[in-house]
């Protein structure tokens, strides 16, 4: 079988083994039984169908193979063993009712992702359509398991490698530290060696002998490649090459000149030990900093941190800092890496105490000259100023950092009389901390210590107060439910009153505010009506209940799902909006969320595994927004009862997605495309048939950018070409950070694996690059107000079951 035949074979979903349809092989009812099993999984085991991430990409609504087997064994007593359950799922895979995201031909009972198709039964009457009949379908499938083709005769496609897949492997390897790469290289080399030995035993008469001859190499003796002294045998790509070419390693005696050269060769790795224990590991790299003043080659190379204890990493960082305007690139990167990731291996209090020790130390690495004391103090102050600049208002809420800054500010006041050179750092410190009073050197003398000055600083603390308290300023998405499964999303401060939220909801529903009321209903059924001045938002309420909007003259909630004038007006409203301006307003709203995310939030999100914690508020908002935009697209389309207007809506959303891509808002772009691909929308065959060909072609091009194959290569290539400002697809960025975290240990031999933290910080700095330039909207003020009101408060249905019911109501099964 040729490569083309194998590739064609791998793409066939309906039946990957035979040229006959599933109905011809398994019978007419087999597909109905398979779809019934799929539908019951979606309805009764929705927790198994979720968005998932693995090393290759992000997959929507996927299931895990082993979990599907467990579920079938639990709910079908007549399925007696795992092999029987595997056979049932293999039938669904053969029939195209489910597919492997990795395009595997066989169902695997392990952590492999599968996705269900959204096609419906084409028969007018299906005996397995009712929920209670699905187990009969499973019994039918069990009877057909013996018809599954034997695996031995199937073409193995595992060796069909492509250039793109090799590029994807290189990208994955780039996210592994050198320690992990060396371990992989050792395993591959060992495997290659065992394979070569076995081959030599089988083909002893075909081996090639390499001999050393005085008259030169034998032309029939094969090719001997020599590894130079500086070739790194730990490099994964070198081992790959040697294994492919079936090379064997031969040890030869070094010539005298080579031995001398080796002795003169400089060390590339340095270990610092204390009491026999390694405390710091450094690696030599070529310097990318300013040109050295002297011609020494030593100045052209620097050492970067591979691993170490927290104290030694900080000590090396301070030693490496210099007080010139331009730092070496390695030093600048080390400083930024340390400040971004220090919370992984030490607390803020530990860092504060360590910095105070370095600032106040009488001796530093032995006897210190008096001239080095102010230099060391200035380095500590430089690090602190960079820390404040990077974290900004994050430090305002930490008691340890506030006390530390007060203490070190007082120490600088005490020291500036003895070391006048610190006056520049003091003024910069005062500017950062908001102390604007001017001082002279005389004022800092021990005889004139100005206690009132520090008291003034303690009382004022402008830099601590400009945001207000967390309770007053924190913003969240408040969900005001209209029915059990539909809500209006309102971005509001935690301190918002019920009247403020009700005003937004009334405007969205186009009803009089005085006719509506907000009611909190707990999951136990208790009701509490909010008064106008009550605080409506509570984190405790999020976990225990919901906020509903009621009409005061009715005992029930509003019902926007009915085919009434309100739903028609909503469709007409969006159809009358300019798609470019609507995309701009989406960009403006998303940019406000994206611009508020602190780089540190990605670190907390990855290491704490808490996506909604206090330290990841802004990141959680943007992720939630992505989900809401996807639901909004499906909601608007499925609430439109007229076929003609529904076709216009789909065209509208395709254009909005294209504009989001053009405006470099990849977060909303992905959300809209995924919303159009939602099963409840994609099944509307009558609607999609009426979409013009040029729109279908445009949508196909947009879909190609969301293709998860080869680790989202299409998206990554397009994103690299975009210039700031731009908004990345945040779930994918988080996946990259998570992959680095899970693929590399945080500690190696009780030392901080700083090489891993550097890779994480480098990925996190993507946010900084995207925000190099700021976004500005060009929408006219009058139009902007209407668009802003619409975009900021989206109306969505968050129940997949409710969306499917609407979908079947619009276009029932044939």
UniProtKB/Swiss-Prot annotation:
DEP domain: residues covered: 43-118
Claim: Lipoprotein is one of the keywords in the record: no
PROSITE patterns tied to this protein: DEP, RASGEF, RASGEF_CAT, RASGEF_NTER
Gene Ontology molecular functions: GTP-dependent protein binding; guanyl-nucleotide exchange factor activity
Domain Ras-GEF: 578-813
Keyword terms: Guanine-nucleotide releasing factor, Nucleus
N-terminal Ras-GEF domain sequence ranges: 301-434
Descriptive protein name: Rap guanine nucleotide exchange factor 5
Organism: Mus musculus (Mouse)
Gene (name only): Rapgef5
């Amino acid at each position: 079988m040729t490569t083309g035949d194998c590739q064609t074979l791998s793409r066939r979903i309906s039946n990957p083994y035979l040229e006959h349809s599933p109905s011809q092989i398994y019978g007419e009812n087999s597909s109905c039984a398979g779809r019934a099993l799929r539908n019951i999984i979606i309805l009764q085991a929705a927790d198994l169908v979720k968005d998932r991430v693995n090393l290759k990409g992000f997959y929507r609504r996927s299931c895990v193979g082993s979990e599907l087997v467990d579920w079938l064994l639990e709910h079908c007593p007549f399925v007696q063993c795992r092999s029987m359950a595997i056979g049932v799922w293999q039938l669904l895979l053969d029939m195209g009712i489910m597919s492997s995201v990795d395009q595997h031909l066989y169902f695997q009972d392990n952590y492999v992702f599968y996705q269900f198709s959204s096609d419906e039964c084409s028969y007018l009457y299906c005996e397995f359509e009712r929920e209670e009949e699905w187990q009969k379908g499973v019994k039918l499938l069990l009877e057909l398991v013996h018809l599954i083709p034997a695996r031995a005769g199937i073409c193995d496609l595992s060796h069909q490698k492509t250039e793109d897949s090799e590029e994807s492997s290189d990208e994955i390897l780039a996210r592994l530290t050198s320690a992990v790469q060396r371990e992989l290289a050792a395993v591959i080399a060992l495997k290659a060696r065992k394979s070569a030995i076995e081959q030599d035993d089988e083909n002893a008469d075909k081996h090639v002998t390499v001999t050393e001859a005085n008259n030169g190499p034998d032309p029939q003796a094969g090719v001997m490649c020599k590894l130079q002294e500086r070739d790194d045998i730990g490099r994964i790509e070198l081992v790959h090459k040697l294994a492919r070419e079936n090379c064997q390693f031969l040890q030869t005696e070094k010539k005298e000149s080579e031995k001398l050269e080796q002795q003169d060769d400089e060390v590339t790795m340095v270990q610092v030990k204390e009491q026999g224990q390694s405390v710091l590991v450094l690696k030599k790299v070529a310097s990318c900093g300013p040109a050295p003043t002297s011609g020494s080659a030593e100045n052209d190379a620097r050492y970067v941190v591979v691993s170490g204890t927290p104290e030694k990493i900080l000590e090396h960082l301070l030693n490496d800092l210099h007080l010139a305007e331009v730092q070496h690139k390695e030093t600048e990167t080390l400083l930024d890496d340390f400040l971004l990731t220090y919370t992984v291996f030490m607390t803020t209090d530990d860092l504060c105490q360590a910095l105070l020790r370095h600032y106040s130390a009488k001796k530093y690495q032995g006897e210190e000259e008096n001239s080095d004391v102010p230099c060391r103090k200035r380095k500590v102050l430089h690090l602190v100023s960079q820390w404040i600049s990077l974290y900004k208002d994050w430090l305002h809420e930490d008691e340890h950092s506030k006390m530390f800054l007060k203490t070190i500010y007082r120490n600088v006041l005490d020291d500036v009389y003895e070391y006048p050179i610190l006056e520049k750092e003091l003024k910069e410190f005062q500017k950062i901390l908001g102390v604007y009073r001017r001082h002279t050197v005389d004022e800092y003398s021990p005889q004139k210590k100005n206690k009132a000055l520090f008291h003034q600083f303690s009382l004022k603390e402008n830099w601590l107060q400009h945001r207000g308290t967390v309770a007053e300023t924190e913003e969240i998405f408040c969900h005001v439910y209209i029915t059990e499964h539909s809500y209006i999303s309102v971005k509001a401060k935690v301190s918002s009153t019920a009247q403020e939220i009700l005003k937004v909801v009334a405007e969205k529903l186009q009803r009089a505010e005085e006719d509506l009321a907000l009611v909190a209903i707990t999951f136990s059924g208790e009701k509490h009506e909010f008064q106008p001045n009550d605080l409506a938002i509570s984190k405790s309420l999020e976990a225990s209940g919901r906020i509903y909007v009621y009409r005061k003259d009715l005992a029930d909630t509003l019902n926007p799902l009915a085919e009434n004038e309100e739903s028609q007006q909503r469709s007409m409203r969006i159809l009358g909006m300019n798609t470019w301006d609507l995309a701009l307003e989406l960009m403006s709203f998303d940019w406000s969320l994206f611009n508020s995310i602190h780089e540190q939030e990605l670190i907390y999100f990855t290491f704490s595994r808490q996506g909604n914690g206090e330290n990841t508020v802004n990141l959680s908002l943007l992720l939630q927004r992505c989900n809401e935009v996807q639901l909004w697209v499906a909601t608007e389309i499925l609430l439109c009862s007229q076929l003609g207007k529904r076709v216009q809506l789909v065209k509208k959303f395709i254009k909005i997605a294209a504009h989001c891509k053009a405006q470099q808002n990849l977060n909303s772009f992905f959300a809209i495309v995924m919303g159009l691909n939602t099963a409840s929308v994609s099944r509307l065959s009558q609607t999609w048939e009426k979409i013009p060909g040029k729109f279908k072609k445009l949508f196909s091009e947009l879909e190609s950018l969301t293709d998860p194959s080869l680790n989202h290569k299409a998206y990554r290539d397009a994103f690299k070409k975009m210039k700031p400002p731009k908004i990345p697809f945040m779930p994918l960025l988080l996946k990259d950070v998570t992959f680095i975290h899970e693929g590399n240990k945080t500690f190696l031999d009780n030392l901080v694996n700083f090489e891993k933290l550097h890779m994480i910080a480098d990925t996190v700095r993507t946010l900084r690059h995207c925000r190099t330039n700021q976004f500005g909207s060009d929408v006219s003020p009058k139009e902007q107000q209407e668009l802003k009101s619409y975009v900021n408060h989206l109306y969505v249905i968050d129940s997949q079951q409710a969306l499917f019911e609407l979908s079947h109501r619009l276009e029932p099964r044939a």
